[in-house]
């Protein structure tokens, strides 16, 4: 009788081998994987392959992110080819070796975040707003899933599909984390369709890099920052809901992640979920398609803190608004915290249902404005320090004086200067910054740059049809041009990630993130990519002045 685990590993090895081979072929639909991508792919372990789904385990969180955002599409396609039917993919994190249990010292009281502020009127660091009482007001965490039975035999192909891939990954994660000592590998059980909702606290929806400690405070965002801290310290007791609005690229998303991360430090076990409105909408649509409405409700209503980014994108989606209305009510009535962000205040979300807008207005509404000069310089100093880049203050002042409306635009300018410095292998100077920013410097006389203009210019530059550039073709030349256009949309427009994805045939926001990161990296390593960005930027600006 054959070993099912050996057969599983052999099948997975064949999938990986095929993928790596395809990535090396010149005319393949699979891109040429980088060294780190190949390494992460080879470190993945198969956990379960079922009827149209697969669960794999990455060795750590960074590898999981790479697999999901950069390689997931190609892995899914290869698995589907090997299985002879469409396949969905779920990724979890392999459990580390369990140390022997030992008595833990009592945890110290959590400290308030130490935050960076822009100097104001020569007074240096300011006292943070919203000082809250120190007594514990932790809300009762929502009910946890039942402990799995680790003594049942592992089933490598379940009798039926799990209620959702998220629940499949979560079920495995809980098996690993709760396995008793003496069991080096948790044995699995088949997953019943009506399993309790998975633990959002473990789904890693929060970006650990976004914290209050690295959020630069100035007069334009101090109140919003203080409100977010207060909500993290006292969920559902300070301000509920908290509604943060402001233009794209000003730090709203950073504050939402920071609040979630800080709340989990203060209140271990708190169930926190961050989603964009696009993700909420897609989850809801998929639950209708797959007849998983109850699973969807458990996932979003069995929480202590729900954060929804860019809530304005619910406009025009009547059925999704209806579901979010009921989700909002369920959480609010259960005394659970809700944090929302938008590019406009509630009153200006005119196509949202009145009952939603009135609920948004029932808590605290605070805005974030474009940062002042000193705050912009402080942001650039923080960014340069985080990237390990040595930049003279005069260069930072030059950049800060030219880019006023968006933090994303500000940091993009610094990235372009740093990339040019790496390419020419010279230290950053004022003269170099002037050269690097020549085509990027904003012109107040320019009309607003649109994604359509960027796509049209990029298609013409590479002699590609516009529909092809917007489409899903995987040829390297087309994929590279599309990634350049996505990067420029991110840098030159105020569009959010979901809106940029919409301009490219409805691509997911993670595809835009991948393109942005890939081109940023290539700009520091490949002169051709840097020159392409410079040339395209100039053409877009010329096109915009017609």
Swiss-Prot record:
Subcellular location: Cytoplasm
Amino acids binding ATP: 249, 251-253
GO MF annotations in UniProt: ATP binding; ATP hydrolysis activity; DNA replication origin binding; lipid binding
Annotated Basic and acidic residues bias: 191-209
Cellular-component GO terms for this entry: cytoplasm; plasma membrane
Keyword field: ATP-binding, Cytoplasm, DNA replication, DNA-binding, Lipid-binding, Nucleotide-binding
InterPro entries: AAA+_ATPase, Chromosome_initiator_DnaA, Chromosome_initiator_DnaA-like, Chromosome_initiator_DnaA_CS, DnaA_C, DnaA_dom, P-loop_NTPase, Trp_repressor/repl_initiator
Gene Ontology terms: biological process: DNA replication initiation; regulation of DNA replication
Biased composition (Low complexity): 126-145
Region (Disordered): 96-209
Chain positions covered by the region annotation Domain IV, binds dsDNA: 422-546
Region annotation (Domain II) ranges: 85-204
Segments of skewed composition (Pro residues): 96-111
UniProt superkingdom: Bacteria
Domain notes: Domain I is involved in oligomerization and binding regulators, domain II is flexibile and of varying length in different bacteria, domain III forms the AAA+ region, while domain IV binds dsDNA.
Protein family (similarity comment): Belongs to the DnaA family.
Subunit annotation: Oligomerizes as a right-handed, spiral filament on DNA at oriC.
Its job: Plays an essential role in the initiation and regulation of chromosomal replication. ATP-DnaA binds to the origin of replication (oriC) to initiate formation of the DNA replication initiation complex once per cell cycle. Binds the DnaA box (a 9 base pair repeat at the origin) and separates the double-stranded (ds)DNA. Forms a right-handed helical filament on oriC DNA; dsDNA binds to the exterior of the filament while single-stranded (ss)DNA is stabiized in the filament's interior.
Name of this chain's protein: Chromosomal replication initiator protein DnaA
Native source organism of the sequence: Corynebacterium aurimucosum (strain ATCC 700975 / DSM 44827 / CIP 107346 / CN-1)
